[in-house]
Amino acid sequence: MSSSRSVYSSSSVVGGSPYRSLSSAPRFTPGSSAASVHAGAGGSGARISVSRVSTVGSGFGGGFSGASNVNLFGGVQNEKETMQDLNDRLASYLERVRSLESANKKLEVQIRQHTEKKGPAKDWSPYYMTIEDLKKQVFNSIVENSQLVLQIDNARLAADDFRVKYESEVAIRMSVETDIGGLRKLIDDTNISRLNLENEFESLKEELIFLKKNHQDDVNELQAQIASSAVTVEVDAPKSQDLGKIMADLRAQYDEMAQKNREDVEKLYQSKVEEHTVQVNLDAEALHTAKSSVTELRRTMQSLEIELESLRNQKASLEGTLHDTEARYAMELEMLGGTAMALETELVQVRNDCQRQQQEYQALLNTKMKLEAEIQTYRRLLEGDSFDLQDAVPVVTTQTVKKVITTTQRLVDGKVVAESNNTEVIKS
């Protein structure tokens, strides 16, 4: 007695490649079964055929032969049920493979559409060159700002030096003006002394004239008395002196004294006048020198004030330029930070997509390996090898995925100018 059964189903494709063809030549042995599995490549049909041939020796009795036929029929029926169950399971697995294939194709279409929508892979090297150029510009700007700050400090120090010089020159000017005031007071005192001496000289001259007049009056009066006197006195006495001679001597003495006094007064007056003239000349020369110094100091002060004003204007201009430069580079840094954050976010999204696709591919690969293992199990079963039901049970594995997100922020003056996220997936 022999029985045969054939099951036809479609083949499956996992990961874009068909399963390999499995075939086994039928083996015919007494009291055993022969099976063959044919799986077409490239989507062709698969056939599982089972045949059982049993031979009974002619020397046995009919009763034994009937019992053997009953037992053999029961064994064949059990094998049919087992094969039916296995075929159903295989069909369900193949159906699952087809569904996974269709899902894989859908994912490939979605990935292709997403890639086409996003366009070709971007070349980031121009951005790197731009970033390097911007870094160099920022560095050069920092150096320029440092130089400007140094120039501002130098200008401030120069302005402080000019201010100190200006204050010292003002102090010198005030002291010179004080000296000029003292010299003017001295000139006034000298003029007063000169006027006093002139007055004294005039009074002495008047007194001299008055003395001369009195002396002449006395002489005239004495001569008149002598002339009017008629008394002649003769005494025996020493010879009297000549009054005319005495008067002449007195007149000569008075004239000599008056001339001497006049000369002394004139000499004193000339010496005083010469001293005051020298002093006045010295004071005038000092005054002229002081005026020249004051004029020079005033001119220097005006030039210093002009230079100070120009330095202030230059400082204000440099500060405005520095402020504009800082604002412009802060804006550029903010724009670059936003671009870098967008690029990093896109990079993280691409990495996550790659990891998700890798996980899906790994799941499909595991399913393919399970199906290949089950096909090998079917093959061993159909070839007559020992079979354990646990070999057909799919192995359930548990995988723990740990995602670590690292956020890096760049702070400038307490403000976030750049932020990057790095996602790391750890499987265990």
Curated annotation (Swiss-Prot):
Coiled-coil residue spans: none
Single GO biological process annotation from the record: intermediate filament cytoskeleton organization
Region (Head) location: 2-78
The protein's name: Keratin, type I cytoskeletal 18-A
Gene name tied to this protein: krt18-a
Gene Ontology MF term list: structural molecule activity
Quaternary state and interactors: Heterotetramer of two type I and two type II keratins. Keratin-18 associates with keratin-8.
Lineage per the UniProt record: Eukaryota, Metazoa, Chordata, Craniata, Vertebrata
Source organism of the structure: Xenopus laevis (African clawed frog)
Processing after translation: Proteolytically cleaved by caspases during epithelial cell apoptosis.
Region (Coil 1A): 79-114
Region (Coil 2): 247-384
